[in-house]
A protein has these predicted regions:
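Short, conserved, GDST-rich strand-edge loop motifs in beta-rich repeat architectures
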Residues: 36-38, 43-50, 101-112, 152-164, ...
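Beta-propeller blade signature
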Residues: 57-61, 112-120, 163-173, 219-234, ...
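A short beta-strand motif characteristic of beta-propeller blades
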Residues: 71-81, 123-132, 175-183, 236-242, ...
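Beta-rich, blade/repeat-based domains predominating
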Residues: 78-95, 134-148, 184-200, 244-262, ...
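Asp-box/WD-like beta-propeller blade repeats and closely related beta-sheet repeat scaffolds
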Residues: 112-113, 119-197, 208, 212
């Protein structure tokens, strides 16, 4: 990506050893490893008034720091596409030097909709460039690629209708192509994405026809209920898992290491967790979120690397649920984290050590031009994670209504820097 620092594979516990070697080495200059892992939190943020530029915020995420939980940096989008993008999901490059934010509603102003930031110096990020795939719009989720670059779900076509696409960017942040070559004619509005490169597998989940969320389009919201199973290497769709009545399969995650190549999605309106059989193309309801809170809108999923724990945000319920999925067809509720009425949790992210879960309280408010009004309270929460519990870290207090001089801001995608790099 943008090689300000050279990436190395040294683990955190090796840093003191390297420092010692440098100290005792002879006159030759020595390169030490510096570990930024878990010290910086990036947040894709929109101006609530839609007048000031959208921006990437940097928060001190070092638990040992006196500035823990404070905004310490900010980079505005530059140029003609700076405002009104509705910053949405976030991605971070495999080498930790680039952050990308998606403009969910950029298409409404006919402007660029994917925004790259150089975070080589995490305390002072810089806007790098923007892009506008010609065949698609409504930028949603990002999946970094090990060789550099990203896969990006684009929920709509160029005018925000169906079909959408999956766009690919290479390590130089250049658009490679939009997939598939010939997309499904009906219901292809990809939002969630998950990969297992070791078994050549990708899945995407269809959520909603974006144009139906606008006041200018008559009628109600046209939710989707389907998951696409892809050949990752060829970027082609192998089969579709239909889930009639799901009411919006907003996210999808493959179970890490699962020999049967299964995964999960959730129906936002029917409130069920579905176990997906990607080989047979079937889905089975295995948990009912209405038992936690009816009408709670289960949304984004995160799984631990061992495939034994699942976290899900419940936007309208003001909760985050933690499930034991060690038996994938029989999930068991472990903990409900209560964030309060009108909190509106949506985006969630686990740290690499899986000891902290970050939660942002904002989904989408289309203000005076659309049908979706899920504002939330604009707070960022951190929960301490153990094998069977979630509890709020009371030291971390961050409210985007008051954090910036320009006024209230809407925080959405969050990502923690996990990087060790060489330093002279």
């Amino acid at each position: 990506m943008m090689p300000f620092y050279r990436s190395v594979s040294t683990r955190t516990r090796s840093v003191p050893l390297i420092a010692a070697v440098c100290f005792f080495a002879s006159a030759a200059p020595c390169v030490a490893a510096v570990d930024d892992s878990g010290k910086y939190l990036f947040i894709c943020t929109g101006d609530q008034a839609r007048k000031s530029p959208d921006f990437l915020a940097v928060v001190n995420f070092d638990e040992r720091s006196s500035q823990y939980g404070r905004v310490i940096g900010k980079a505005d989008v530059q140029g003609a596409s700076a405002t009104g993008n509705e910053f949405h999901h976030i991605g971070m490059s495999a080498d930790g030097t680039t952050v990308v934010c998606g403009g969910l509603l950029s298409v409404l102003k006919s402007q660029d909709q994917i925004f790259f930031f150089d975070v080589s110096n995490p305390r002072a990020p810089k806007f790098h460039s923007s892009a506008n795939p010609p065949l698609s719009a409504i930028t949603d989720d990002f999946q970094s690629l090990p060789q550099g670059g990203f896969l990006v779900t684009m929920m709509g076509g160029a005018q925000g209708h169906s079909p959408g696409r999956v766009a690919e960017f290479n390590g130089q942040l250049e658009l490679v192509k939009e997939y598939p070559e010939t997309p499904p004619a009906e219901g292809f509005n990809p939002h969630g994405i998950s990969l297992r490169p070791e078994v050549n597998l990708m899945v995407t989940s269809d959520f909603i026809c974006p144009s139906t969320t606008l006041d200018a389009v008559a009628g109600g919201l046209d939710f989707r209920g389907s998951v696409r199973v892809w050949n990752l290497r060829d970027r082609t769709i192998l089969r579709t898992i239909e889930i009639p009545g799901a009411g919006g399969t907003i996210d999808v995650k493959l179970i890490p290491g699962d020999p049967s190549e299964r995964g999960y999605t959730a129906g936002m309106l029917d409130e069920h967790l579905y176990l997906l059989d990607t080989r047979r193309g079937t889905a089975k309801a295995v948990f009912d979120f209405a038992t936690i809170s009816k009408g709670g809108w289960p949304q984004l999923l995160r799984l631990t690397r061992d495939g034994r724990r699942l976290f899900i945000s419940m936007n309208q319920a003001g909760k985050v649920a933690m499930l034991d999925i060690s038996r994938p067809d029989e999930p068991r509720l472990l903990k409900i984290l209560e964030l309060g009425a009108n909190s509106g949790p949506h985006y969630i992210a686990l740290t690499r050590d899986e000891k902290r879960l970050i939660i942002s309280d904002y989904f989408l408010n289309q203000d005076g031009f659309g049908k979706v009004h899920a504002e939330g309270d604009h707070k960022i929460h951190v929960a301490v994670v153990t094998s069977n519990d979630l509890r709020l870290d009371q030291r971390f207090q961050l409210d985007f209504n008051t954090a910036f001089a320009q006024g209230a801001a809407r925080p959405h995608g969050v990502a923690v820097l996990e990087r060790t790099y060489a330093h002279d």
